[in-house]
Amino acid sequence: MILMPMASVVAVAEPKWVSVWGRFLWMTLLSMALGSLLALLLPLGAVEEQCLAVLRGFHLLRSKLDRAQHVVTKCTSPSTELSVTSRDAGLLTVKTKASPAGKLEAKAALNQALEMKRQGKRGKAHKLFLHALKMDPGFVDALNELGIFSEEDKDIIQADYLYTRALTISPFHEKALINRDRTLPLVEEIDQRYFSVLDSKVRKVMSIPKGSSALRRVMEETYYHHIYHTVAIEGNTLTLAEIRHILETRYAVPGKSLEEQNEVIGMHAAMKYINSTLVSRIGSVTIDHMLEIHRRVLGYVDPVEAGRFRRTQVLVGHHIPPHPRDVEKQMQEFTQWLNSEDAMNLHPVEFAALAHYKLVYIHPFIDGNGRTSRLLMNLILMQAGYPPITIRKEQRSEYYHVLEVANEGDVRPFIRFIAKCTEVTLDTLLLATTEYSAALPEAQPNHSGFKETLPVRP
């Protein structure tokens, strides 16, 4: 593009009336013009080199950030430690960025909310708090004030979640730090008490005779329901009856997607592999075990990608998983954690939930990550004496929301969600064998008077 004017200058026809002096003057002017153009082009070349250097620098920085697993912003409790990379904190900042007009409206709404609260009009105040956060999701003062408001309503878990979210955005916010120091011990107490309730129910389930026909029937139904819900979460449209037909008869359902039916067969194969090979196995869970699970999950749908790590970058909602070249390294680190003493000392539900989250965070496969993560979670639960649990398709929105909250820095809502699913499974088994359901301990309401709710999206 730059050379085109030069070509046109050279191609100008010389007038016939030009004298020798005129020819000399013409050549002098042409030399000056070429010299000026070269003087202009040389800096442009330098600028181009600088641009390329900057791009190379960005590429190098991106690579370093992808590998910077130890440069972290931690948002943890002593019982549940999860590190979030600085890159992910940046993604959160981008996500919560509001327009200048939105920020002004958020501040006005917060001031009105505080005034309504002062006047005792708590219903209006709550709506205004939520409106402020809708206008500016990263408004730390609004998060902190809504946390105080929730704490006054004795919704300690919600308050602690809001303080934690504020600190994820602004780690040195003084008021949020003070408030979270107050709520954290209370929340840990609530969580541990809930785990104790689950342990009590597990002991009741384990006391049911293995030959119980009622238990056998409900476990069989649970098996079909688990496959139905875990593929439905991913968008599979087969009904429970159709899934039962496929697995019992080995015949395809006419008029239905063969790919969806192969997803069901793959889940069935993966669950058989876990039940027959891994549950009773003594020893570490390895990368090969996870690859074998995935090979069965995806093997009937995409045999080329089944059982192998992805080779392309993917985007999952607001989350950017690790670069493909870092997947194997992160899976090795994940496996080390999976078999570490720290992980083994966690409560089984907490351990299983964290394993699920960490695997889906890495997103090591091109497809089938959610199904594989849920299977790994159930493997850990079964090895600890818990029954496999089911996340129902009706819970899909809540499930994805708490995963997103975990990506933002607080994994505890996801752990509580898995704990709630675990309790539903245990209650189902106990109620199906009614003689063992007497005097079940209740997790809610708890004796402290605190509400035990999952955080809601403002």
UniProtKB/Swiss-Prot annotation:
Ligand binding (ATP): 234, 316-319, 367-374, 399-400, 407
Q: Which GO terms describe its cellular component?
A: endoplasmic reticulum; endoplasmic reticulum membrane
Annotated membrane topology: Single-pass type II membrane protein
- The listed location of motif Inhibitory (S/T)XXXE(G/N) motif is 230-235
Q: What is its EC number?
A: 2.7.7.108, 3.1.4.-
Q: From the UniProt record, list the coiled-coil ranges.
A: none
What is the UniProt remark on how the cofactor binds and its stoichiometry? Divalent metal cation. Prefers Mn(2+) over Mg(2+).
Could you identify this protein by its name?
Protein adenylyltransferase FICD
Q: Gene name on record?
A: Ficd
